[in-house]
Amino acid sequence: MTAQPPLHHRHHPYTLFGTSCHLSWYGLLEASVPIVQCLFLDLGGGRAEPRLHTFVVRGDRLPPAEVRAVHRASYAALASAVTTDADERRRGLEQRSAVLARVLLEGSALIRVLARTFTPVQIQTDASGVEILEAAPALGVETTALSNALSLFHVAKLVVIGSYPEVHEPRVVTHAAERVSEEYGTHAHKKLRRGYYAYDLAMSFRVGTHKYVLERDDEAVLARLFEVREVCFLRTCLRLVTPVGFVAVAVTDEQCCLLLQSAWTHLYDVLFRGFAGQPPLRDYLGPDLFETGAARSFFFPGFPPVPVYAVHGLHTLMRETALDAAAEVLSWCGLPDIVGSAGKLEVEPCALSLGVPEDEWQVFGTEAGGGAVRLNATAFRERPAGGDRRWLLPPLPRDDGDGENNVVEVSSSTGGAHPPSDDATFTVHVRDATLHRVLIVDLVERVLAKCVRARDFNPYVRYSHRLHTYAVCEKFIENLRFRSRRAFWQIQSLLGYISEHVTSACASAGLLWVLSRGHREFYVYDGYSGHGPVSAEVCVRTVVDCYWRKLFGGDDPGPTCRVQESAPGVLLVWGDERLVGPFNFFYGNGGAGGSPLHGVVGGFAAGHCGGACCAGCVVTHRHSSGGGGSGVGDADHASGGGLDAAAGSGHNGGSDRVSPSTPPAALGGCCCAAGGDWLSAVGHVLGRLPALLRERVSVSELEAVYREILFRFVARRNDVDFWLLRFQPGENEVRPHAGVIDCAPFHGVWAEQGQIIVQSRDTALAADIGYGVYVDKAFAMLTACVEVWARELLSSSTASTTTCSSSSVLSSALPSVTSSSSGTATVSPPSCSSSSATWLEERDEWVRSLAVDAQHAAKRVASEGLRFFRLNA
């Protein structure tokens, strides 16, 4: 096969089929005409191998006001100005972003086509191969051509290290310095306002199997990374830079923003040193330029001429592929998220011919994001955060028919990425039955394909590595809300239409649905009808297929439905954001671009079935910092079967369920061996509660359950990944740290004083981590579930006390839990010879003692656990 000659050696216009990978602002030339660079991937058309080119595109002439906005000041100058207030600085950043984004997305008719990155286009260049003259969406391109071409390219993995000056507080506080201290929301912005900088930089690029290390001005190394070409355009000399073999640059989410910006500034100086023509724009917008931080997203409008983004951790970075990069960029729906709403594309929805009138499906549209959680509120109960909670009985659940009017939507704007505050809300569901997680696998992807044209979102790229198609689609839909309201509302309405009919059908068929997430994930119990048992999976599949055909018609079957896993019926919503329960899965590395989608976490083996079931309930349980296991107690009064004794004596605390001396490695399905974080350990233990509480338990048996959590914590006490949490910028008190880290969602651990310690995955665990804070919160979750179980047992057993004819004789002095044929747990009353009043008194005493015993057990085990952590710190 004859190699294709370079474009700049040709003397006639040439047509190329390929895709735009990135648009960047080069500069303003004569008559205020903006020039945009386009990194273009030529697919080769079967004549040659795919190849990267850099072209220029003319934009429409800018008005004088926008020209002044571009030339006035850089992002850094606008963000660090001490003569303006915070609102004025923010408006300055937004105004500059709006001008740059308008040119990069809508600067001309050609730019509007090329701004749809990683979608097939056809272009025509001038004879010199410099300027794109025409561009249009490509028709008839093989669906796998783009994926095959991208598989031949790489992502450059960039790691930058350096040194920082010591930060000294000023002895004399000036008025400006006082304003900085009052206004900053993160350590990062405070440092920026005080002139923080980095020096002694060293950077490493890994492209495929090759690694390039730059510590000085090594032009030979740069020549292997970037191809430089000087061209003359509109009587101006330009230097076009094209990456060699890679289509994007990725960094870890722990990369310091200041080091990253400094690295690209250094490379810019080397590549354009001694250049007499006009260099491209050099600017940077990142989360460190905002007072309260922002998403971990980077916008380099001019140089480098490739997209730059962050992934979660060094291990993920080393496995990043060009297909992952394409998925990441596609999910932006325009420019990186840090640019804001001005950086998103306008996407027109498809005109649909549906079998349902508009007013029937449009009513289900909501502003909630794709990861929003919808709870079945028929059994919601709220309890006050303060007061004597042990004896406060909640009101009975509301009963409004099928319960479809009793739904609470939980916002998920952060994706559950960060832990709530100490005074968070626990929303608890407990039921002694097998709960199924039913997944509509490809619902979101197929609805998006129906509503958005392929030229706006390419559905044919194979997302099979870091990012799943669902994660890309979900973030793309989220970004439609800013400038494509009609498309966003259409998609959300159709998804809500199907989701709401699934839960309505479950309720009508006698199935208890507990929670739905993102329109595609449902937590449902099997049920019974007059004809026999009803399968949750079959019910959901039938409803989805029925309403899919009703909407779109034809013989095309609906999206695929399956039971992803099953576990005992325990779910806890923490702070309206994170789900904790006995489910053994995580949401991938997360989603595009942002933080991981921390969804349901837990560690229970799928398929475990509880037996008889107690009336299910979702109860709001408020947790204050002093509740649950306090983490502080008198060591002399700790349990004799405590952690230290269990380590060597084999004392079992009187429990034949879980011996307190059982080492963590011997615990069935232990998350210590399977991985997962501390919430996984808690979720695993929560899954054992329904089976444990079917009959009366002693204090020592309750202590054994709390001690199981403690054992798991002790076994992973030095494991960094086990304790890491993801925190949002500006929402917590963060300890001072080197670099610029806390300006975006960052990983950290709790300290005993309630502060947040910035913690890297690749360094040793902080010596002063607050183990007691984790123990306190974990024990509070367990105690909340026990209390909910006790009160639901009390509520569900009321009906069984009205008659003696259906009662059974107790085998012990106190009532025990038995299974009823209706699938709910009841407390068997004493025989007719016993006094009903006496039995009620015994029952109430037992139920109240269960909650009190759980609180006492939590305090005793927390006391011995804290003693161990102090001695072994």
Swiss-Prot record:
Localization = Host nucleus
InterPro entries attached here? HSV_HEPA
A GO BP entry:
viral genome replication
Spell out the residue ranges making up region: Disordered: 394-422
Q: Which Pfam families match?
A: Herpes_HEPA (PF03324)
Taxonomy, superkingdom: Viruses
Q: Name one GO cellular component term.
A: host cell nucleus
Which UniProt keywords are present, listed alphabetically? DNA replication, Host nucleus
Q: Which family does it belong to?
A: Belongs to the herpesviridae HEPA family.
Subunit description: Associates with the primase and the helicase to form the helicase-primase complex. Interacts with the origin-binding protein. Interacts with the polymerase catalytic subunit.
Q: What does this protein do?
A: Component of the helicase/primase complex. Unwinds the DNA at the replication forks and generates single-stranded DNA for both leading and lagging strand synthesis. The primase synthesizes short RNA primers on the lagging strand that the polymerase presumably elongates using dNTPs. The primase-associated factor has no known catalytic activity in the complex and may serve to facilitate the formation of the replisome by directly interacting with the origin-binding protein and the polymerase.
Return the HAMAP family for the record. HSV_HEPA
Under what name is this protein listed?
DNA helicase/primase complex-associated protein
Q: Which organism is it from?
A: Human cytomegalovirus (strain Merlin) (HHV-5)
Q: Which gene encodes it?
A: UL102
